[in-house]
A protein has these predicted regions:
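Conserved glycine-rich beta-strand-loop-beta hairpin in the small C-terminal domain of fold type I
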Residues: 192-206, 218-233, 247
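Conserved core of the PLP fold type I
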Residues: 1-91, 102-124, 239, 296-298, ...
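Helix N-cap motif at beta-to-alpha junctions
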Residues: 235-239, 278-280
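Conserved core segment of the aminotransferase class I/II
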Residues: 118-199
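Hydrophobic "anchor" residues on beta-strands that sit immediately upstream
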Residues: 60, 94, 130
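Walker B catalytic acidic pair
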Residues: 98-99
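PLP-dependent enzyme catalytic core of the Aspartate aminotransferase-like
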Residues: 125, 248, 262-306
Length: 306
């Protein structure tokens, strides 16, 4: 296959809502992005199969399979198996399996993610997937270590390219991480400390949402068992207005459409909430302001319709 840069037309499938930095990479390189709606089981696999198996310009799909950013979905076993059994029209199609939140549990009763590579090996499709993760939200963002998993063929290809980019890796940083975490048990123990900080914050926001918006019919939201985000869908056509009202009241949110390619939410309804940084007291105040703005925006829309 020719390098993607020498091919005229490239497409990537983008589960939505999804991760803005994934979409930003495609945008920088001029790769056309195609929205694939998320379901409670993961991406709409019937749509994924239709695109991948029939269009040889579809070269990849972005996936955050555990606690997806931003809706917190963990892909079901059936979804993972359907990924492994894709029959791409393009020989150079790849699944970009970004398992960024693989140990970021907020609950003891957390979902299990089937191993995609194991499923691919069963059907001989292991060249189709590139799996990766990092300690960005475990140790230090931008100063952690990263890992990649793929077939020998893909690894040989990647090593040849990386060898031209760097002479060596930051061995001292790798050593720091090994000495600090030591092993899998060390990582898990450390993540319990993260959970102790994060879960009360998630609970505070979700509790306020229930208190202020239950039964109002103006918003639905996720209650994730892990990850870093709460995804809120307000009334269609209201997300940008909610964010504008919040800003006027002193609460800054991520921009409308951030979880969609080209920052264009076709229904203008999704808002990503990241409750990790503020104190619980600040979160409770901000969540109340947010719910009030949801009510105001919904009221404006309903009045305008009449």
């Amino acid at each position: 296959e020719k390098p993607w840069g020498q091919q005229k037309k490239l497409k990537f499938l983008c589960p939505v809502p999804g991760y803005d930095r994934h979409f930003g990479i495609c945008e920088v390189f001029g790769i056309q992005m195609i929205n694939v709606p998320m379901t409670p089981e993961g991406p709409d696999m019937t749509l994924v199969e239709s695109w991948v198996n029939n269009d040889d310009t579809v070269k990849g799909i972005w996936c955050v399979p555990q606690y997806a950013n931003p809706d917190g979905t963990t892909y079901s076993d059936e979804t993972v198996r359907r990924f492994a059994n894709l029959k791409p029209a393009a020989g150079d199609f790849r699944i970009f399996w970004d398992n960024a939140y693989c140990v970021h549990h907020l609950d003891d009763d957390h979902p299990h993610l089937l191993n995609l590579m194991d499923e691919c090996k069963k059907v001989g499709s292991e060249d189709m997937v590139v799996m990766f993760c990092s300690t960005s939200k475990i140790s230090f963002s931008g100063a952690g270590v990263a890992a990649i998993g793929c077939s020998k063929r893909n690894m040989d290809h990647l090593k040849a390219k990386v060898a031209m980019q760097t002479i060596s890796f930051d061995k001292l940083n790798q050593l720091r991480h090994v000495r600090f975490f030591k092993n899998k048990a060390g990582v898990e123990a450390h993540m319990l400390k993260h959970r102790a900080l994060l879960k009360p914050r998630f609970d505070a926001v979700i509790r306020t949402f229930h208190e202020e918006m239950d039964g109002a019919g103006i918003a639905v939201w996720t209650e994730p068992k892990g990850g870093y985000f709460i995804s809120v869908d307000v009334m269609d056509g209201c997300a940008a207005r909610v964010i504008e009202l919040c800003k006027e009241a002193g609460v800054t949110l991520t921009g409308a459409g951030c979880a969609y390619p080209y920052h264009k939410d076709p229904r203008d309804r999704n808002i990503r909430i990241a409750p990790s940084y503020p104190s619980i007291e600040e979160l409770e105040k901000a969540a109340k302001i947010f719910t009030l703005c949801c009510k105001l925006a919904a009221t404006e829309k309903l009045l305008a319709a009449n």
